[in-house]
Structure formats: structure tokens, C-alpha cells
């Protein structure tokens, strides 16, 4: 299998320049996936990781930055709470209802956990649940933007998830990689960090191709690069693979937002990224005048 070629930045000076400007980012959206929040052996929440994540986010606030957390995990937490292992087989007649019931249980438990940990660091957090209609509808989008803006003024960290309890195919965004990019564009963020179970973007699947090369910086999202993610799949816990991360990169970079994919194995990479360290894959923001967020979101399932 040959390694595919994609446009990337290789010059060391360019890499350093792009990384250095991360130090000046003022409004940051951080997304963490379901698999990053749980112990793989049991499916229970990893409280150590949660504590480190909250501490890192609070430290960002203490550095004077506005912060948003987009978190997965509600359905997984709910399934664990009501002892359901596989929604598809547990209730084949109406799996959507089972999924939404698990989300209702899990979202409450997840937020309770976050609130307790944030309180230990004297930080106030807020919950925001979104669907596609939050962005597509002009009034809903306006109100959501105002809510985020007021929370930032109050020094609050918004915790965002999709409203899985009511979302159906017609109004769902579908994964939190995409949701986090939509949120970043909505709040006019200047940096989006996707924490996942991968180090970043490679020229090919490193598990299948030993010659696959790690990509440090991507300056342009070419069609060939976007096609690379379409065959990827996510973990058994989450809903996103590399394809959703590249879609997120498309939304973010088109909105002039830098985006980084980094491994959540060590949550402390967050402050290292903001210190300009060369961690993960950096997608460079490049405003596209033709890009319209509500239109893109409205047509997502049609692409």
C-alpha cells in the first residue's frame, strides 16, 4: 500500500510560526470524546482524567481565556447506569427511544460529575444542549450566540453536548467532532482542540501502512485529504472517526479558526498546546468568504 500525498507544511520555520501564534488565542473550544472519558476495561467514567481535564480548563480561564467544553459521554454513562450493553439488541423495536432514555439518564449524571469537579476549582459551569435547529434557525442561532456571550462575560465555562434526548435524524448533528466545530464558529472562537484516541492526522492509516507519515501542519484542506477520512471509523464507544474530524476541520478553518487534533491519553497536552509546543496536527484557519455556517449545517446529511 502506497502512502498518499497531501498538501502539508514541512518547513520548520513555518511550523514554529503557526505554533507560536497559539499562545495568543483568546477563545478556545475543547472537545473530548466518549472513549477518552471512560476506562476501557469497565466502561465506567475515568475520574482521574475528568479531574485533569477540568483542572486544565480552569487554568485556561485563570489565564484570561474564554473556554467552551464540548463533551461526549451522556449515552454511554446512561447505558452503564441502567445496565444496557448494546442498545441495538436490547430493544430492537425502538432503539432510538432506548438511546434517548439513556441520554436523559446519562446527561444528568455527567453534568453532576462535571459540576462537582469544577466546584472544587471554584469555577462555575453551565450546560448547553444543542440540535441542528439551534444553528439553522436564525432566531435560535442568535439566542444561542447571545447566551454564550453572556456566559463568557460572567466567567462561566459552558459545557455543550448534543440534545440526544430529543434529537432525531432530521435535527441531529450526529457527532461531537462536528458539533464542536459548529460551536467554535458560532461563538467566534480562534482555536478548536479535538482530544481523541489518536495522535493526529497521518498520510494513511498507520495501523495498516508502516510507511504512513504523521502530518504536523495542514495549510489547505484539499479534496484528496478530505477523501482520506471517508473510510475511517470511530471507536465502539464514540460516533466519530477521522472523517468527522476532517469535516470539523473544514468548518473550523473555513471560519478562520485554527484546529488541532491531539491524543487525549495525556490531558495535560492542553496547556502545552497553548504554550506553542508541537503537539498533534494543526489545521490552519483560512477564512473562506463563500462559507455559510447555517447552510452547511442544514445540508450536512445531504453531502
Outline where the language-model segments fall.
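C-terminal catalytic "cap/lid" subdomain
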Residues: 2-124, 128-303
Amino acid at each position: 500500500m502506497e502512502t498518499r500525498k497531501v498538501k502539508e507544511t514541512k518547513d520548520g520555520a513555518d511550523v514554529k510560526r503557526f505554533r507560536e501564534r497559539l499562545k495568543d488565542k483568546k477563545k478556545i473550544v475543547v472537545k473530548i470524546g466518549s472513549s477518552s472519558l471512560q476506562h476501557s476495561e469497565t466502561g465506567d467514567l475515568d475520574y482521574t482524567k475528568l479531574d485533569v481535564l477540568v483542572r486544565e480548563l480552569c487554568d485556561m480561564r485563570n489565564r484570561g481565556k474564554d473556554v467552551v467544553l464540548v463533551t461526549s459521554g451522556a449515552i454511554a454513562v446512561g447505558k452503564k447506569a441502567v445496565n444496557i450493553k448494546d442498545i441495538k439488541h436490547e430493544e430492537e423495536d425502538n432503539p432510538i427511544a432506548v438511546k434517548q432514555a439513556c441520554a436523559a439518564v446519562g446527561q444528568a449524571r455527567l453534568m453532576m460529575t462535571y459540576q462537582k469537579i469544577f466546584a472544587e476549582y471554584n469555577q462555575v459551569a453551565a450546560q448547553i444542549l444543542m440540535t441542528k435547529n439551534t444553528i439553522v434557525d436564525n432566531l435560535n442561532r442568535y439566542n444561542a450566540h447571545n447566551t454564550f456571550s453572556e456566559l463568557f462575560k460572567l466567567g462561566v465555562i459552558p459545557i455543550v453536548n448534543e440534545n440526544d434526548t430529543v434529537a432525531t435524524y432530521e435535527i441531529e448533528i450526529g457527532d461531537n467532532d462536528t458539533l464542536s466545530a459548529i460551536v467554535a464558529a458560532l461563538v467566534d472562537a480562534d482555536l478548536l482542540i479535538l482530544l481523541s484516541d489518536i495522535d493526529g492526522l497521518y498520510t494513511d492509516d498507520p495501523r495498516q501502512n508502516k510507511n504512513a507519515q504523521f502530518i504536523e501542519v495542514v495549510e489547505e484542506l484539499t479534496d484528496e485529504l478530505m477523501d482520506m477520512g471517508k473510510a475511517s471509523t470511530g471507536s465502539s464507544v464514540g460516533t466519530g472517526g477521522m472523517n468527522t474530524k476532517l469535516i470539523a476541520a473544514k468548518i473550523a478553518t473555513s471560519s478562520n479558526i485554527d484546529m488541532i487534533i491531539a491524543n487525549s491519553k495525556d490531558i495535560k497536552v492542553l496547556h502545552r498546546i497553548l504554550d506553542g509546543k508541537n503537539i498533534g496536527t494543526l489545521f490552519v484557519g483560512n477564512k473562506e468568504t463563500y462559507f455559510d455556517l447555517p447552510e452547511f449545517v442544514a445540508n450536512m446529511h445531504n453531502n
